[in-house]
Amino acid sequence: MTQNKQETGKLLGRLRIHGGPALWVALLAPLAGGALLVWQAWTLAEVLGQAIEGGQPSALLMPGVGLILGLLVVRAGLGALGEQAGLIAAEAIKRQMRQALFTRLLDRSPRDANAAASGLAAAAIVDQVEAVDLYFARYLPAALQAALLPLVFGAIILPLDWVAGVLFLVTAPLIPIFMALVGWGAQIATDRQARALSHLSGRFSDRLKGLLTLKLFGREEAETAGIVEASEALRKRTLKVLSIAFLSSAVLEFFAALGVAGIALYVGLTFIDYLHLRGSPLTLHVGMFLLLMAPEIYNPLRLLASHYHDRATAKAGLLEIERQLGALLDKPVELADIAPRSGPAIGVTLNTLTLRTPDRMRTILDGA
């Protein structure tokens, strides 16, 4: 079994190719929505500036309002398209993984002493494969958005107001840095939770199959107590993972709120002439655009933080699969189609056939 977590990350990377075009749609649709978001915020700020500062009548503002509504509808459509495509890609990848694992199980000899128990193998194929679902459907699109959109938004804002641009570019990296620190502890807790889930699933399945034997030997109460103990261990490990997730999300929200509050404070103090850091007056149009974009710069990072533990869950699931069934095949082995032979039947004659048990202690057929 591979002990290095980097190998698990490489395997997740290789599995992406099985997502097909749907995965590309899931990755690119949110980026297109981010580009439209800038256009929408700029148009909304322009409409507000014209209405408040310019005093233009509502009839002249209706084209801008219509454009804003149209952009909202298109962005909602792109969001739904990306989400559905992510689910389709994840299902395709899980199907490929299960085919590969079934192939590995069929290739194993029934006499293999190292083979996993049937309950553990079933848990690996069902539960642990399911653990990669949200990695491809949610985490990967969120990671791409977090890597690109804040930088693009910051680059757009920087020429308009260098103070706001610098504030964004300084505060935004604090969130990924903290996520990396939290991720170390989260990965360990998630690995333990995956092992506890696999142990409980395998134990319950095996005991269920041997229920009659357990009752005959009067062991049903002892095994029930053992399953209760395993369930309690899983509950504690799951709560540990959830506590780390909630704590990290709270701290990340704190950093994001500080960034948004800093922009709001800067814009407000500039408007009332308490700050004079700009070379030119701050217009209402630009000020509203900065306020509208402030939460949007942190949204991709917050989205990544909310799905960051899906990455740890996927890695833990792959490690558990490897521990129970061995290294995952990159591609399932395609079994050739077996067509019935045409023509006359073939006869086979065996003389003096002897058949013994594998330990050669008993003779089943002698000299037939």
Identify the residue ranges that each predicted region occupies.
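Membrane-integrated ABC transporters
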Residues: 1-36, 61-63, 86, 131, ...
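Juxtamembrane helix-loop junctions of ABC transporter transmembrane domains
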Residues: 4, 40, 44, 71-114, ...
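An intracellular "coupling" helix at the cytosolic face of ABC transporter transmembrane type-1 domains
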Residues: 15-20, 110, 127-136, 140, ...
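Transmembrane helix-loop-helix hairpins at lipid-water interfaces of multipass membrane proteins
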Residues: 17-78, 163, 274-281
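Transmembrane helices of ABC transporter permease
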Residues: 18, 22, 26-32, 142-192, ...
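Hydrophobic alpha-helical segments in the permease module
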Residues: 64-79, 249, 281-306
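Cytosolic ends of transmembrane helices, especially the final helix of ABC transmembrane type-1 domains
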Residues: 219, 243-246, 295-324
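Primarily ABC-family ATPase nucleotide-binding module
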Residues: 325-368
